[in-house]
Amino acid sequence: FSVRTLADDRLIGFIAFDGISWQHGDTFVAIGIGDPTYRGNGYGTDAMRVMLRYGIMELNLARVQLNVFSYNERAIKSYLKAGFSIEGRQRGMLLRDGCRCDLIYMSVLRNEWLALNTDQLTASSEQA
């Protein structure tokens, strides 16, 4: 899916599920905001929230997961805001600018996401 600005419908990034396992009800999610001027403005967090809602409510997924390098603190903060939890790390996975960086594993489970979004879901069903 494309990530676009509301003001002028400018294409600024992408978000996608990768490798949905229908048998197990899980998938990886990937996101990228290409133009650095649009990073840190909530577009990624908003896109991830919409994607999680779609995956959990429409595709009936039980688990959505992603990996992120430890140097990408802005992304980690965004994923935590969207409902992800850190579940592990692979230490020293990447050499970047002479420093070793960890690969962080994050996921959100259906029941966790539902608990975090109960008020929003109730309001949506009352409007329908």
Regions picked out by a protein language model, each given a short descriptive name:
Residues 40-42, 115-121:
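Short, charged, solvent-exposed linker or helix-capping segments at domain edges/interfaces
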Residues 9, 42, 72, 98:
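Conserved G/P- and acidic residue-centered "switch" motifs that form tight phosphate/ATP-binding loops
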